[in-house]
Structures are given as C-alpha cells and as structure tokens.
From Swiss-Prot:
Other information: ODAM protein is the unique constituent of calcifying epithelial odontogenic tumors (CEOTs), also known as Pindborg tumors. CEOTs are benign but locally aggressive pathologic entities arising mainly in the mandible and commonly associated with an unerupted or embedded tooth. They are characterized by the presence of squamous-cell proliferation, calcification, and, notably, amyloid deposits.
Protein's name according to its UniProt entry: Odontogenic ameloblast-associated protein
Keyword Cytoplasm applies: yes
Gene behind this protein: ODAM
Protein's UniProt keywords contain Glycoprotein: yes
Species of the source: Homo sapiens (Human)
Pfam families attached to this UniProt entry: ODAM (PF15424)
Function: Tooth-associated epithelia protein that probably plays a role in odontogenesis, the complex process that results in the initiation and generation of the tooth. May be incorporated in the enamel matrix at the end of mineralization process. Involved in the induction of RHOA activity via interaction with ARHGEF and expression of downstream factors such as ROCK. Plays a role in attachment of the junctional epithelium to the tooth surface.
C-alpha cells in the first residue's frame, strides 16, 4: 500500500507543470483561434488582464502576423519578441499602421515617377503659347465691338418713310401735331389775322381744352380731335376736373349786364309806390 501511494504522489508531481513551459492552456486557446484565419480575429485583444502573465511566443506571433498581414515578413523575430513583451495588444495595430504606410509609400512612388514628366516642360514653353493664342482673340473681339460703342444713335441717318399720296389732309394734320399735345399740354398760339374777317380761336392753356372747330389758313374747317378736357394733374392732388367740357357758349357775352329776372319787378314796385303816395 505504501509503495502504491508513493507511486501515485510521484506521478502527480511529475505530471504537474512546476516550471513554466511554452505550451500552456492559454497558448492552446490561441492556437485554436489562430486556425480561424478567415475570420481575421485578434486573439491577444480578447484575453484582457491576462496579457501580463502570457510569455512572448515568437513562433506563434510570427504565424499570427503572417496569417493576418502578409506584408510583415520584413520584421525580424527579435523585434516581434520585443513588441510582444512591451505591448502585446498593439502588435497587430502597429503592423497594420506600418502596412498602411507601406501602401501609401507604394502609391506615392508612381506619383513621383509621373510628376517629373509633368514638370519637365517649364513655364517658358507654356506662356508664349498662351499669349500668342489669347491676344489675337481679344484684339478681334475689340475690333468687332468697336463700331457698336462709338456710333451714337443720333449720328445714324434717320430713315425717311415716303408718304402715300392717298392720305387726306386730316391725317396729315394729325401727323403734324407735336408729341406734347398728346399729354394735354397745348401752348397758347398767336391769333393771326385771316382774310375774310375770321379769326382763329385761341387755345386755353390752363384747362388744356380746344374749340371743336379749328380754322386753317386756307379757310377749310377741319374738326379738331381733342374735344374733352384733359386732367394733366396728378390724381392724388385733390383737384377734380370734369372729363367732358361744356360747349363754349357766347350768349352771355352779347346780353346786357342787367339781370332780366329783376326787370319785371321794377314796374310793379313803381306802381305800389305810386298808389301809396296818392291820397
């Protein structure tokens, strides 16, 4: 019995890992996670506070970095061991950063190779071509628009339209009316003496009215178109003028200054005064 018990203790002590070995339970879990390369998992970031207890595994880290990022083969094993001992969680991040820098450097190199052909033709070759191309175009535009700005409208010859002989004298008289007569302003014309004892009626400059019939120098009567009074004041001025002007009546001119309504009363009052005076 004693021998069996001693053999049991001996086997237990031999099987127990008294010295830290490279293959531990954590390493076995890392190896299982490293087999899932397609998922691109980061096993060192999943361990949390146990990172300080994990010794650096150069072989496993090399396989891990090569599996995730193939561009890290340039790093040596000693550098990986140092990074694993100091910051094991940030190793893939530094690798990705270095790979990104390498990718950027790879992108910059073709640009640097392409830029020298672009910078070879200096500005001395470009500027004369630009000036020689733009200057004649600008000069052509200047000569093209030069007559437009210099020729003034009143200097251009006016186009005279020949009048047709079928126009009546009334239409010709309407054409000879000045433009300011259309807005109600008619100047007061002089009254020339006309043979035959007739005189031309003067226009009224205040109301802007004209007589119905204007006598021409030839003696023919032509109806004047402007028969209505024209209000040439502003509507908001507060002055109202009738639209139709009454016909000029000359009856009161030739009548006596004494009112006719008072004249019948004068004999009656005279009779009353005479009857009162009689005894």
């Amino acid at each position: 019995m004693k021998i069996i018990i001693l053999l049991g203790f001996l086997g237990a002590t031999l099987s127990a890992p008294l010295i830290p070995q490279r293959l531990m339970s954590a390493s076995n879990s890392n190896e299982l996670l490293l087999n899932l390369n397609n998922g691109q998992l980061l096993p060192l970031q999943l361990q949390g506070p146990l990172n300080s207890w994990i010794p650096p595994f150069s072989g496993i880290l090399q396989q891990q970095q090569q599996a995730q990022i193939p561009g890290l083969s340039q790093f040596s094993l000693s550098a990986l061991d140092q990074f694993a001992g100091l910051l094991p969680n940030q190793i893939p991040l530094t690798g990705e950063a270095s790979f990104a820098q390498g990718a950027q450097a790879g992108q910059v190199d073709p640009l640097q190779l392409q830029t020298p052909p672009q910078t070879q033709p200096g500005p001395s070759h470009v500027m004369p071509y630009v000036f020689s191309f733009k200057m004649p175009q600008e000069q052509g535009q200047m000569f093209q628009y030069y007559p437009v700005y210099m020729v003034l409208p009143w200097e251009q010859p006016q186009q005279t339209v020949p009048r047709s002989p079928q126009q009546t004298r009334q239409q010709q008289y309407e054409e000879q009316i000045p433009f300011y007569a259309q807005f109600g302003y008619i100047p007061q014309l002089a009254e020339p003496a006309i043979s035959g004892g007739q005189q031309q009626l003067a226009f009224d400059p205040q109301l802007g009215t004209a007589p119905e019939i204007a006598v021409m120098s030839t003696g023919e009567e032509i109806p004047y178109l402007q028969k209505e009074a024209i209000n040439f004041r502003h509507d908001s001025a507060g002055v109202f003028m009738p639209s139709t002007s009454p016909k000029p009546s000359t009856t009161n001119v030739f009548t006596s200054a004494v009112d006719q309504t008072i004249t019948p009363e004068l004999p009656e009052e005279k009779d009353k005064t005479d009857s009162l005076r009689e005894p």
